[in-house]
Amino acid sequence: MAKRIGKILLGIFAAFLVLIVGYVAYMQIQYYRIDDFTKLATENPQTEQVQKGKAYRIMTYNIGFGAYSADYSFFMDTGEMLDGTKTVGKHARALSEKAERENTEGSLNLVKSQEADFIFTQEVDEKADRSYQVNQREIFQKGLSGYGSVFANNFHSAYLFYPFLEPHGAVQAGMLTFSKYQILENTRRQFPVSDAFITKFTDLDRCFLVSRLPVDGGKELVLIQVHLSAYDKGGLIRAEQLALLNEVLAREREQGNYVIAGGDFNHDIAESIESFPSGQKTPEWVYQLDSDDLADGYRFAKAENAAEIPTCRGADIPYEKDVTYTVVVDGFIVSDNIEAKAENIDGGFLYSDHNPVVMEFTLL
């Protein structure tokens, strides 16, 4: 009897081991990174050209794959209350398909209300279990039909069977750049990313999207959409990413181009680490960037209301004003031949864990 039980237990263990090995092999087979310098086509291309001396509006908004309503928390986020209580997010997927669609439409309407000439959006799902297969890319492109657009994939993962009771699943997601003006070409540049055994299967395939627009007089307006790493202990990968971005910024300035780099920097870019009332301690992931960290001739266009309106909330707990930690991590870098004025938009974190940022600018 004992031998029989032992054989059964051994068989169960062997089957479990086969499943684990098979799953790891599946993840490894599915794993890849997109090549650097990948050219991307503009969909619905526009023909009007950008002009010097004319005022334009550009917007950036991380829509959080349509999951982050105010009552949402994300399983990978951790934190700590001021009294020392540890916190961790609960969910790996949107609360429901209905919530997903409501948040996506809410984000789209918020974007449309700003009437920007150029739009950067991050965490846009194209086909993902976490967003119930709601195609946010298609929804945004249809909703912004008067713009040319380009999509850069920066998250393509095999099926992640974790958390076990609510698996994150498979993901195809990325960034969308929209423009009412002619784009000459788009290039997806690869950021340095971690190749650690587990992390490489779960982290984004980080990139920045470079779009070149012709300007009267022979120069170019170079729009660079970025989404830097967040879950990077010690900030080493983020430092490498910033170094590469600075190389590109310096090269474009040498050529006399106009440059705007914007998006989700996952760093405090407005000296806002302790600007906003909070019942939580400052998260470990919050690092600071300022204009001194950028290539010569560049600056962060700090929003005039940066001390009043944050752009990002902690996702380890649902959002509650003056309780959940908030900070400014979204915005724009501009070259010194651009006049710019930015504003953080108070979206109340209703549809995303981010608020949009809008910048008015003029090419000098």
Residue ranges: model-predicted function:
Residues 232-336:
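Metal-dependent phosphoesterases centered on the DNase I-like endonuclease/exonuclease/phosphatase
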Residues 90-96, 124-128, 191-200, 227-236:
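Surface-exposed cleft-lining segments at the edges of enzyme active sites
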Residues 3-142, 153-162, 166-172:
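N-terminal, active-site-proximal structural segment of metallo-dependent hydrolase catalytic domains
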Residues 63-66, 124-128, 154-158, 183-184, ...:
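Solvent-exposed loop/turn segments at secondary-structure junctions
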Residues 142-145, 170-186, 213-216, 320-339, ...:
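Conserved beta strand-loop-helix elements of the APE1-like EEP
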Residues 57-63, 90-93, 103-133, 178, ...:
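Active-site beta-strand/loop signature of hydrolases that rely on acidic residues for catalysis
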Residues 37, 156-220:
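A well-ordered secondary-structure block
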Residues 198-200, 318-323, 346-350:
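Short proline/glycine-enriched turn/loop segments at secondary-structure junctions
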